[in-house]
Amino acid sequence: MNKTGIAHIYASQNNTIILVTDPTGAETIAKSSGGMVVKNDRDEASPYAAMRAADMVSEKLREREITDLIIRVRAPGGSKSKIPGPGAQSAIRALSRAGFKILRIEEVTPIPHDGTKKKGGRRGRRV
């Protein structure tokens, strides 16, 4: 019997957060972030911190006997960056190397349908 979990990976330019829930999304199984594994604030979003956070999560998943993962990658989105941060790819790679079967990878970044105005004013950011 294969047990499935959903890995929500939120990767911004400042941090990488990994949260694993059950398939309904109601129960949190494990969570970790780049800030929990490194000391410097500037290293929270690094691929190394994301890899260590994914290793912490994978240990908790083995205790719960979860074998399959659905991965949902999210960037800040909205009026902010729509590109995931540097830790997203290394977190996915670390989870696959830990021996979990990845069923699918989804991109769930929120896209505005002409929502709020971008910051910077009428004439944009002047460099």
UniProtKB/Swiss-Prot annotation:
Function, in words: Located on the platform of the 30S subunit.
InterPro entries assigned: Ribosomal_uS11, Ribosomal_uS11_archaeal, Ribosomal_uS11_CS, Ribosomal_uS11_sf
Organism listed in the record: Picrophilus torridus (strain ATCC 700027 / DSM 9790 / JCM 10055 / NBRC 100828 / KAW 2/3)
Pfam families: Ribosomal_S11 (PF00411)
Annotated GO CC locations: ribonucleoprotein complex; ribosome
Domain of life: Archaea
Protein name per the record: Small ribosomal subunit protein uS11
Keywords: Ribonucleoprotein, Ribosomal protein, RNA-binding, rRNA-binding
Self-association state and partner proteins as the record states: Part of the 30S ribosomal subunit.
Gene Ontology biological-process entries: translation
PROSITE patterns the UniProt entry points to: RIBOSOMAL_S11
A GO term for molecular function: rRNA binding
Family indicated by similarity: Belongs to the universal ribosomal protein uS11 family.
